[in-house]
Amino acid sequence: MSVWDPKEILDSIGLGKRTEVKRSTRVADAIRKELAVLLLEKIRDPKLQDVGISRVTATDDLTIVKIYYTIYGPHKHVKAVDKAFLAATGFIRSHLARTLNMRYTPNLQFCYDKTAEKVAEIENIFQEIAKERQDNGENS
């Protein structure tokens, strides 16, 4: 009679094995965390106060990192935030070089993340459809 081994069972169905995460994904996650701390504690630019980092992607060779940001609040001043990030790029890269201990610090590209706007548009479309269905249901 064999003893039930949950690890063996999970491994046999593919749930127990830990999948390897690519280095570029780990570095992108570390950059996202460091950048969030920088925005909260060290960067004093008022244009970057209502900015949050939504996601960070890195190329496999870690030469380019794209940082997607969102702007919170009613005033969406994307061009001003782009200029502020461009001005702070050197400071951010030097901080990342010190904290991440990488041989080469990747080039940073800041991109406005339009996901929230697209979600709002889709929600409006769904609300319009629901309203039309409700109006048609009441009239019939």
Swiss-Prot record:
Any Pfam family hit: RBFA
UniProt-recorded Gene Ontology molecular function terms: ribosomal small subunit binding
Keywords: Cytoplasm, Ribosome biogenesis
Subcellular location: Cytoplasm
Predominant location category: cytoplasm
GO biological process: maturation of SSU-rRNA
GO cellular component: a single term: cytosol
Oligomer status and interactors: Monomer. Binds 30S ribosomal subunits, but not 50S ribosomal subunits or 70S ribosomes.
The family this protein is said to belong to: Belongs to the RbfA family.
HAMAP family, sorted: RbfA
NCBIfam families assigned to the protein according to its UniProt record, in alphabetical order: rbfA (TIGR00082)
Function: One of several proteins that assist in the late maturation steps of the functional core of the 30S ribosomal subunit. Associates with free 30S ribosomal subunits (but not with 30S subunits that are part of 70S ribosomes or polysomes). Required for efficient processing of 16S rRNA. May interact with the 5'-terminal helix region of 16S rRNA.
Protein name: Ribosome-binding factor A
Source organism per UniProt: Desulfotalea psychrophila (strain LSv54 / DSM 12343)
Gene: rbfA
